[in-house]
Amino acid sequence: KTVCEKGPAAGSAFSFPHTVYNAAGGYLSIFTGLKGFCATIANGTQAGLQSVICACDELRSGAVDAVLAAGTDENSENITEVYSHLPLPGHVVGEGCVTMLLEDAAAAQARGARIYAEILGYAGTHQAARYGAEPAQEQVDRTLAEALQDAGLTAVDRLFTAQEMKARTGDARAASAALALAEACRAVSSGECRTAAALATGWTGSVSCVIVGWKEA
């Protein structure tokens, strides 16, 4: 804003680090002393879930024993204004931040940590399409199947959670995916009705799925 009003000479190079996507990861490292692998994923509504997948890949490789995986979304007046004009009936833009410590099971047990859940498997797919295009139902079905296969599970007694953009086509796709598992799933839920949908950019045609096994408290 200062540069726009007063020109380039009024800008400061020290302001730049606050404007880039990977600033949050840098601050975490500075304030906590964390070192090692660090990545920033900017992929709209898939970013938080894909950060979990990325962290799991690092854990599976054996390169690390623990990883912080985070997803954050902060709204602005501009974002709220833009999405208020999109054809998304009933859609409410949400914001917030979640950070999870993902750790190798053996390492967590060795330090006596309380284990809330176990990530059993995951998968993601992508299709080349124009900007704003909805992924085909085939991609959704494939993602679910691959995630279950990676986890070594079937849909029996699984809880299926659907997250979509509240666009009619998106809701229809989520419903279709749920119906595909309806005979086997114990329950189907969608959290957006309570939390609204947090997002950073538009749709990218990506679909992600993480199979989580919750531990008894």
Stretches with model-predicted labels:
Residues 139-159, 165-169, 188:
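Conserved active-site "lid/cap" helical segment
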Residues 63-85, 89, 124-135, 161-194, ...:
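Acyl-CoA/ACP chain-elongation machinery
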